Amino acid sequence: MSHPVEIDPILLSKVSKPARYVGGEWNSVVKDHDAVKLTVAYCFPDVYEVAMSHLGLRILYALLNERPDVAAERVYAPWPDMEEVMRSQGYPLFSLETKTPVRDFDMVGF
C-alpha cells in the first residue's frame, strides 16, 4: 500500500467545505489494501454532494465492497478552492477512505 496523502489541517481550514475531504462518514468501507487482491478507485466526475446523491454510485460501491477480495474507495472532483490548495501543495488526487493517491490503485473506474 502506498503512503496516504496527509492533508495539513490548517490548509484544510481554508477551504469552504472541508468535510468533503475528510471521509469517515457512516457506511463508508475501509479495507487494508495489502489484504485484498484488487483495489479500485471509484471516481465520480463531480463534487462530493452531487456524487453522494447518485444512487448508482452508492449501489456499485456497496457491491464492490461486499467482495472480501476487493477494496473500492471513492474519489470526487475537488471544489476549485481545494483544487488550488492541492496544486499549490503538490497533493495528488486521492481517495476519501484512506487518502490513497489515485495513481496507486489497481483499477480506476468512472
Segments (PLM) and residue ranges:
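A short, structured N-terminal alpha-helical element that caps or precedes a catalytic domain
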Residues: 1-110
